[in-house]
Amino acid sequence: MRASKYHLNTLKEAPAEAEIASHQLMTRAGMIRKLAGGIYTYMPLGLKVIRKIEGIVREEMNAAGAIELLMPVVQPAELWMESGRWEQYGAELLRIKDRHQRDFVLQPTSEEVITDIARNEIQSYRQLPLNFYHIQTKFRDERRPRFGLMRGREFTMKDAYSFDRDEAGAQRSYDIMYAAYQRIFQRLGLEFRAVAADTGSIGGSRSHEFQVIADTGEDLIVYNPESDYAANIELAEAPALLATRAAPGQDLEAVPTPGAAKCEDVAKLLDLPLARTIKSIVLAVDQPEGPAQVWLLLLRGDHELNEIKAGKLPGLAGFRFATETEILDHFGCKPGYLGPIKTARPVHVVADRTVANMADFVCGANREDYHYQGANWARDLPEPELVADLRNVVEGDPSPDGKGALSIQRGIEVGHVFFLGTKYSEALKATFLDDNGKPAVLQMGCYGIGVTRIVGAAIEQNHDARGIIWPRAIAPYEVVICPVGWGKSETVRDTALALYEALRARGVDVMLDDRDSRPGVMFAEWELIGVPLRVTVGERGLNEGVVELQARREAEAAKVPVDQALAQTLAKLDLL
């Protein structure tokens, strides 16, 4: 491609609303243009990157035995009602009506449609296993779309769905997709981790996220550098109880703590480590009849509640945070001074594993401006009703596999695999005849990759002050040839054209910048766009018999003889 015949429109400044590097750089590089909140036009450069990602995904899915189809973006509401998600999905599900006032949705996902296909297409165990996939536009009506393609409303995903006759087969399909995802992200040239994850609202019993490592990532990834253990922060298990609890060493005492409503303030006021304090979190679970059940969750002052873990405890499914009225009714005190000793009304008490092992701790006294110091289980209050893992792990916690300490880094979720079991196939009555001629329910798995999200994630991981640094596999162009003096020197033109045609003949995706721009402007623009390798052809260099190769990731350019320019360019590309 020649730049003079292409659409390049880079910007010096990013829009004020662009908060993160990928949004800023994609806009400045002319890859996307905003149409509405969370909705973007993919300009030619951006679309090239997307198509390259799709190509790698498609190749690996096909190689893994998946079969491509294409499901519609607009789906009838009846299917969503049948699965129960018409009401469950919430405001992110964009509901529309046609001219006949029939309800439809713009698909945020395709479990209902693919299960409908399966129940109509799969009759016998002889047709199994099957794995269908598509690459399609999705729409989720995010409350606050932001970060460009990282959290948009309209986006492109690859969805795959496996169907098996039994759970053992479904687990094999899961493993095949897991391995395919490993290959996909390796080929994309991204640093990533596959981490165990919560299944969330989509359901199922086994799940892994594929996270691109980036300092700006919203997710926290917990891993053990000395083993294969890796999990999302929501799922990572905190250490179990120590063998014994220390004996009480202090008397219980109510001490004044005026204005100290946070554990940090209490610890500072009493000159104690924050780890000696206990924070009280009050939850409520609404009941079919009568008032809500009130629960008191206790965590160490320096730990944070993991709401996913809490929601999985017996009796706490569907919890909400208690209202101030409920708190006053059960504790006789406003938040900030709550504790498990002498509550006004009975509450269910759940202690984190760490808290259950504490002695001589500090907790709220259920009296404004007072805390208890020297509190001890059994002596001053009953043992907790339940001891559980309630907290997020922290850096340095022992690894659950017993092989060292945990580390934490940030990541961006770009892929997710789930074993669904029969959640959707039972709801939509997707059955087949087994080898005994009896009806059986299909076992399912689903596997998603955020195609457009990968674009943003790749930039978040690969950029510098000058612009994007694309991995070769997904760069809009692999090489850009920058002739200095295109309009003045026939030798420069001929040399640049010869190299351009030679690279094209060898299948290299190359751009020739024939716009006769000033060198500084031309170089800065291609550094912003992030092409992995630049070849500079100038009259001064040609007089010396050389051209310059500049890898985007490297500080220094290399001079190579003109007659070796093709070979050296190809060799350099192989190293990128």
From Swiss-Prot:
Domain-related comment: Consists of three domains: the N-terminal catalytic domain, the editing domain and the C-terminal anticodon-binding domain.
Domain of life: Bacteria
Cellular localization per UniProt: Cytoplasm
HAMAP family: Pro_tRNA_synth_type1
UniProt xrefs under PROSITE patterns: AA_TRNA_LIGASE_II (PS50862)
GO terms assigned for molecular function: aminoacyl-tRNA deacylase activity; ATP binding; proline-tRNA ligase activity
NCBIfam families, A to Z: PRK09194.1, proS_fam_II
Organism of origin: Bordetella bronchiseptica (strain ATCC BAA-588 / NCTC 13252 / RB50) (Alcaligenes bronchisepticus)
Keyword Nucleus annotated: no
Catalytic activity: tRNA(Pro) + L-proline + ATP = L-prolyl-tRNA(Pro) + AMP + diphosphate
Gene: proS
Biological processes per GO annotation: prolyl-tRNA aminoacylation
Pfam family, one: tRNA-synt_2b
Disulfide-bond pairs as recorded: none
GO cellular component terms listed in the entry, alphabetical order: cytosol
Protein name per the record: Proline--tRNA ligase
Family in the record: Belongs to the class-II aminoacyl-tRNA synthetase family. ProS type 1 subfamily.
Keyword set, alphabetical order: Aminoacyl-tRNA synthetase, ATP-binding, Cytoplasm, Ligase, Nucleotide-binding, Protein biosynthesis
Function field: Catalyzes the attachment of proline to tRNA(Pro) in a two-step reaction: proline is first activated by ATP to form Pro-AMP and then transferred to the acceptor end of tRNA(Pro). As ProRS can inadvertently accommodate and process non-cognate amino acids such as alanine and cysteine, to avoid such errors it has two additional distinct editing activities against alanine. One activity is designated as 'pretransfer' editing and involves the tRNA(Pro)-independent hydrolysis of activated Ala-AMP.
The enzyme's E.C. designation: 6.1.1.15
